[in-house]
Amino acid sequence: MPSATESKPETRKVVSIVGPTASGKTGLGIAIAKALEAKGEQAEIVNADAYQMYKGMDIGTAKASPEEQAEVRHHLIDIIEPDDAMSVARFQEIARAKIAELQAREVRPILVGGSGLYARAAIDDISFPGTDPEVRKRLEEREKVEGAGALFDELKTKDPEAAARMDPHNPRRTIRALEVIEVTGRPYSASLPHYRYVIPTVQIGLDLPREELDRRIDIRTKQMLENGFVEEVERIRPRLGITAGKALGYQQVVDYLDGLCDLNDTFMSIAQKTKRLARKQMGWFGRDPRIHWLQALNPALLGNAMAIIEHADAGDYDAIDAQADAYTQHHLGDIA
C-alpha cells in the first residue's frame, strides 16, 4: 500500500529530464531512479538522445557507461546499427511503446536526453506527416517560376492558421506546408507541434551558469580524446551512415583521419561546436513553460527534483500545464 508520500501507479507522471549537453542529465536520472527505489517504487531510464541509440557510438555521444547502466536499467540505447537511420517519427513510435510497456509493469519511465524534439515527440501532441518527393519537386519548380509570394498566398487560402504562424519569407517552410496539405488532405496546422502532453509528464530542466557549462564541455572534450574517440570513429567509419554521421564530433574526426586538419584543431572545433549546440538547446527548451528549471550546482538538486515529482503526481501542475500551448503560441509564436 502506498505511503503518505508514495504515489499510486495510476497517478505517476513520466519524468523527463532535459537541458543542454554536459549539464548532468544522466546523473540526475540515475539519482532519481534510486531515490524512487528507496521509497519502494521501481523506475527505469528511457534514452531520448538521438545518437545514443546507435551501437558503437559510445564516447562521442557521452553514452551512459556500463557501470551507470548497471545501476539503473536503461532502454533505447544501442538499438540500431550506425548505417541505419533513426528519425524522430520512428523514435516516437518506439519510445511510446516502451513507455507503455514500463507503465504496464508499474515501472516509472524516466526520459533522459538532450535531443529536444525527440524528448517532446515521446510525450507531446506532435505528428510527423510523410513526404512525397514528386509533390515537393513540383512545388519547388513553381516557386522558381511564380515566386515565394505566390505560394504563400496559396497557403493563406488553403490553411490561414498555418500561414498566420509562419514567416512569408521562408519558402522552404511554405513548400513543406503545401506538400503536407496535398499529401495528407489535412491542414498543415493540424500537424504543428503543440505544448500539450499526450502522456502525463513532469519535465525537469537542468540549468548551469554559462562559464560552468563551457568548463564542463572543455573537460568532456578532453576526456573524449583521452578515452579513445579517434579510435572509435576509425572503427565504425566504414559503417557510419548519413544520419549517424551527423552526430557532433564524428565528421570532425573523419576530417582529421583524412589529413584535413591536425588533432588539436579537431578537438578545439568539437568543443566550440558543442558550446554552440548547448546555447541552441537552451533556447529550444527555454520556450517550454512546463519545464521546472533547477540549478544543477545546487547541493539540494535531488531533493528539489523529488519534491517537483511529488507535486506533479498530486496533480498540482496539471491546470498550469493545460494552458501552456495557448500561452506559448500567443507570447512566443510557432517553433515548427
Swiss-Prot record:
Keyword tRNA processing: yes
GO biological process: tRNA modification
Amino-acid positions noted as binding substrate in the UniProt annotation, renumbered to this chain: T21, A22, S23, G24, K25, T26
Reactions it catalyzes: adenosine(37) in tRNA + dimethylallyl diphosphate = N(6)-dimethylallyladenosine(37) in tRNA + diphosphate
Catalytic activity, EC: 2.5.1.75
Cofactor field: Mg(2+)
HAMAP family, sorted: IPP_trans
Protein name: tRNA dimethylallyltransferase
Organism: Bifidobacterium adolescentis (strain ATCC 15703 / DSM 20083 / NCTC 11814 / E194a)
Gene it is expressed from: miaA
